[in-house]
Amino acid sequence: MRARYMLGFGVLCLLTWAVYVSESSPTDKQAKLRLMSVRRARQNKSRQGQIIKTRASSTWINDKRQQMQGDEGVQFRRNVQSRKVLAQRRPAQGGTRNPIQQDDGTPGARARVSRMPSSAGSPNLLASFAGKNRLLVISAPHDSDGYYRLMMSLLKPEVYCELAERHVHQIVMFHQEGELGGKIRRITNEGKVMEEPLDTALIPRLMTFLKLEKGKFGMVLLKKTLQVEERYPYPVRLEAMYEVIDQSPMRKMEKVRQKGFVQKCKGAGVEGQVVEGVLTTDSQVDPPTERRKEIRKPIRRPTTTTTPAPTRPTTTTTTTKATTTTTTRPPTTTRSTTTTTTTTTTTTRPTTTTTRTTTTPRTTRANTTPQWIPAHKTTAEPYYYNRRDRYQTTSPPTDSARYRDNHTSKKEYNHRHTNTIPTQHKPTKVRPTKKKNGDKDISNAYEEKYDVGVPTDAYPEEKEEEIVPTKRGKGKTDKKKKKDKTDKLSKKDKAERRGKDGKGGKKNGKKVPKILEKEDYQKPTKRPPPPPPPKGTLATFLDYFESRRRLILITSPTEENSMYIQQRDEYLEHVCEMAIRKVTIITIFGTFRNSTMKIDHYQLEKDKPMKGLRQEDLENQDLIMELRKEYGMTYNDFYVVLTDLDMKAKQYYEVPIAMKAVFDYIDTFSSRIREMEQQKRDGVTCKKEDKPRSLENFLSRFRWRRRLFVISAPNDEEWAYQQQLYALTSQACNLGLRHVSVLKLVGTDLLDMGGVLELYPINGSATVEREGISATLVRDIRNYFQISPEYFSMLLVGKDGNVKSWYPSPMWSMAIIYDLIDSMQLRRQEMAIQQSLGMRCPEDEYGGYGYHHHEGYQEGYHQGYGY
């Protein structure tokens, strides 16, 4: 037994010695060194990957624009050392793949292999945009090409901030022999266009790489990864490009990060300015030496001074300031007496009420004596400042008659309050002139009715602003709080002034004591009146309109409610009639407990403009709830209430009502009869037109009822125009079933302009109704849809009023347009109803335009538009 143990121990020692001898041999040492070098190479590669990631993260934090523009791309700069290692490994891996992909293991880089051009087949120019910018490449034979001129006319100066927000740069190329040329248009964050010439040697390579045809106009929209996003053989509206770009998921993240970018860009004031030069931030591809230097010092990047964090709150505050908008609508009808109407729209949203506290107060404007400016009263000034800015509007000029803005500028505001001193707010010591007192009595009865309430502690300086001429004016709130102090100060001032007059002062003379004696005598009569109801209550809100306006209150769940849209389109056609009857429309959107309010005043020119209401009242949910309770509008449905001047409800409507019936009923009111007699003596009437043809009224006829197919040409002899008319022959049934109306516009000058509207029956019959269009309406329609009168173009407008497609050339086959219409969601519902009723065009007239799917370029042209 012991012999076995000894034998085993000896064998174990022998094996240990053999292993030691083998490891100490020279060949094994070389193999071990090779293994260690391989391990070190792998460790170096992993460290380089970590450095690249650290550099990417530091760049993400330090440069906001680089962060946003790098959403769809990856970093294309790599270390030269890693490239050498990959070159050594390439023979073992086949040597067929791009080294850029071998260096980057991310999914985006793997997917980019099929999209990124090889270094031999693509110009390096595109690499400067990769991962940072989208690119719009415009190719034309020469700069006088019609399509090129049309596209450049669409690139107006006011669109470059929108392009900059989407990180879109442009390359323009002219490829005709003898006229080779081009330019690179880089757009800065301020909307400025930096132009630099394009090397003519790159134009053939770009044409080949982007597969653009020579001798023809063409455009290509490239993603940030240099992948082709969309191809356009014709000029297209920029809104169509925006839709394609905005469908990207990363574009949605850009929108969130760039809130307020467009407003800030337009605020710079240089949008659309073209400057010759090179944009430093978007330089072309760096040489290898530059890239090697940047890779070796990636940790220094966090020391840059760019800090994007403070810019986010500034952009958000600019978007939340637009809490109230005031719009003015021109009059639709007038008489020779220049009767005009003014509409003031005040819209509110309760989610932005906190931004008013950021306004800087102005403490030295209302008072003239520094010692009478209390420190705690300066918080009320932003309220008046915001209100003045909030209700400022600009009214476009009209041909029929001018109409006034329904706002008060700073100069008018100060002047009115300088001459106006409400009796309820008059302090103990006021020394206005007799003329100012007279103005006070006149204006109080008409205009200052809403502002007579006693303010709360949040608005202690309201009375001081209304008493600008006074030196030592105080409001009622201050009287209640500091009654004893006020009496002492008044007695002291009185004694000082009498002492000065007794000494023979020449400044005041003998008039001052008389005025003071009168005021002292009238002082007891000013104190007894009880305080009016506080602001923000329903009684104060209705007092603002009582004896001055008739109200039409409308409640609707949303602004897209069909019944509300029908009622709105109805009353917008009778603006002048509502102004004569002093009608104010209050529209409340939302549920009973969460609503927003909009107020429209319809006034004549001679009427005194209505003062804007306080923002707190328009956003006060309790006030809106009380208003709905007062008139029985507690349900979340469409509802209309009509009141007289006494604010008492006269009529209720649960469905949209014709305004003619409303006007006839208003004319039976006793208060209205007196107005009619006075207006008849003054000759105030609305000019009657056979058919109102304003642009808004014209387009409202088709909204949610018809689709519009607009054809515009310089003249009726245009070849493209005649070809399109030939394609429309025998299409009455197809157009009628799809609820399409054809609008033909011709002429370039206003004297030559004209148009025809063709209405096809929706039951598919072959009868067609035609209406003439005036020259002014043709001009307005072209301006609204941005149609150039010098070129042939066609538009398809949906029932929602938005342009669905644009065709710069005639469509030989209407099947393409029919397929686009049939793909819309609303049209599918119409098709289901028509098929259930058996409504279908005959096959011989149908011309094969069934509900089947057509293939071709146009299908790809509209693919992804989300119609």
UniProtKB/Swiss-Prot annotation:
Task: Tell me a GO cellular component.
Answer: extracellular region
Give the residue ranges for region: Disordered: 83-121, 282-539
**Where is composition skewed (Polar residues) in this entry?**
95-104
Q: Pfam families under this entry?
A: DUF4174 (PF13778)
Bias class Low complexity marks the residues at: 301-370
Question: What is said about its interaction partners and assembly?
Answer: Binds to various extracellular matrix proteins.
Q: Which domain of life is it from?
A: Eukaryota
Q: What's the protein here called? A: Coiled-coil domain-containing protein 80
Q: What spans are recorded as compositionally biased (Basic residues)?
A: 426-435, 471-483
Q: What does this protein do?
A: Promotes cell adhesion and matrix assembly.
Assigned protein family: Belongs to the CCDC80 family.
Q: Does the keyword Nucleotide-binding apply?
A: no
* Keywords for this protein: Extracellular matrix, Secreted, Signal
Instruction: Tell where it localizes.
Output: Secreted, Extracellular space, Extracellular matrix
Q: Where is the signal peptide?
A: 1-18
Q: What is its main location?
A: secreted
Q: Name one GO biological process term.
A: extracellular matrix organization
